[in-house]
A protein has these predicted regions:
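Intrinsically disordered, low-complexity terminal regions enriched in charged/polar residues
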Residues: 1-282, 286-289, 294-298
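Activation segment of protein kinase catalytic domains, centered on the conserved DFG
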Residues: 293-309
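Residue(s) on the long, well-ordered alpha-helices that form the structural core
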Residues: 307-310, 314, 327
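Contiguous, well-ordered alpha-helical segments that form the cores/surfaces of helical PPI scaffolds
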Residues: 37-42, 312, 329-332
């Protein structure tokens, strides 16, 4: 949780009058909103979170914020300086009693053990070798130095969601980060399967929560083996349950939805605005080919080939053209919320 302090009673960037727009559009108040949005973006980028809290102190009033990938819920102004008002102190007291999951930490991500981190770094060094493949070396260097970027263990449920089918992956720094606190917030990681010790590509994102819209795994299965489509392993919505390694009890999420999903959209209809806010569900996929940012192409010919492959791959995913699929090619690429290009690294499955 972060706290932003602003002096002056006019620094509150929101109106509290139903007859006026909610957001104040003065230059200073727009700058204040931009500042707290930036803080929220950084917080949700560098930590594995499902949501986050923050506090804004604007002169003699305070506001509470709850951020997720759909937007932010903003409280009414709290006159914390007024004698007898304990709302802000009560929030801080309750926040102190919360556990990590209640504060918004992702319950499926853990600090890697020393042995897991060492195995991950050793596998990276073995694949890079002497660094003759410059593109591959840049990709694997993206995991960052172990002293500055702690290794994490990410646990992903297989489609059936059974405890014994949870797969663990070790990751470092992400290849690219989201620049907004809302939306898909796609992040890609070079990851090591803890079970096999092989390197894979793990994509973490938030897919739109729209009835009837299927996750990427559904469509990848339909075009499996097609040219210009990545070699897919598995993918699923991220569940709210924590799988205890001791085999003991699990911690359930909200009873109405077993998956990590946004809440801001559920309350957006109660306030001004004619557009319905779209919610998001946390989603992860794993491919057995590596991917690097689109701007790491080698030359103009490589870039043109990449764009051609993107068009072909997206047409297959969009229309699920199953007959007469071409055999896999060394380079494959796809785009869903972020562009990437396949490397010539060895297949890992």
């Amino acid at each position: 949780m972060f706290v932003e302090f602003k002096r002056g009673n006019t620094s509150d960037p929101f109106y509290n009058d139903d007859q006026l727009p909610f957001e104040k559009l003065f230059e200073t108040t727009c700058a204040t909103r931009g500042q707290i949005v930036l803080y929220s973006t950084r917080l949700q980028t560098y930590q594995f979170r499902t949501w986050a809290f923050s506090v804004g102190i604007f002169g003699n009033v305070a506001r509470l914020f709850r951020w997720d990938r759909a937007g932010a819920i903003v409280s009414e102004p709290i006159p914390y300086c007024k004698r007898g008002n304990h709302d802000l102190a009560e929030f801080l007291r309750r926040f102190d009693l919360m556990d990590r999951v209640q504060r918004g930490w992702d319950p499926t991500v853990f600090d890697a053990t020393r042995e897991e981190a060492a195995a991950f770094d050793g596998t990276i060094e073995a694949v890079v070798g002497e660094g003759r493949n410059v593109l591959l070396k840049k990709l694997l260097d993206s995991v960052g130095d172990k002293d500055n970027y702690p290794r994490r263990r990410v646990e992903i449920s297989t489609p059936d969601g059974e405890d014994e089918r949870v797969v663990s992956y070790i990751v470092g720094r992400s290849i690219a980060n989201a620049r907004s606190p809302t939306g898909r917030a796609t992040r890609g990681f070079v990851a090591m399967s803890k079970g096999t010790g092989k390197l894979v590509f793990l994509k973490d994102s938030w897919r739109p929560d729209i009835p009837g819209m299927m996750g990427e795994a559904h469509w990848f299965e339909k075009v499996k083996g097609a040219r210009s489509v990545s070699a897919f392993l598995h993918g699923s919505d991220v569940r709210c349950v924590v799988v205890r390694r001791s085999g003991a009890a699990r911690t359930p999420g909200p009873p109405t939805n077993p998956f990590q999903h946004t809440l801001t959209n559920l309350y957006s209809g109660d306030f001004c605005g004619v557009r319905k806010m779209v919610g998001y569900i946390h989603y992860r996929t794993v491919q057995c080919e590596f991917y690097v940012p689109l701007d790491m192409f080698k030359d103009s010919k490589h870039l043109i080939q990449i764009m051609y492959d993107i068009i072909v791959g997206m047409s297959l995913l969009s229309f699920a053209q199953l007959p007469s699929l071409n055999p896999p090619q060394p380079y494959r690429t796809y785009t869903t919320g972020g562009s990437s290009i396949g490397t010539s690294a060895p297949r890992t499955s």
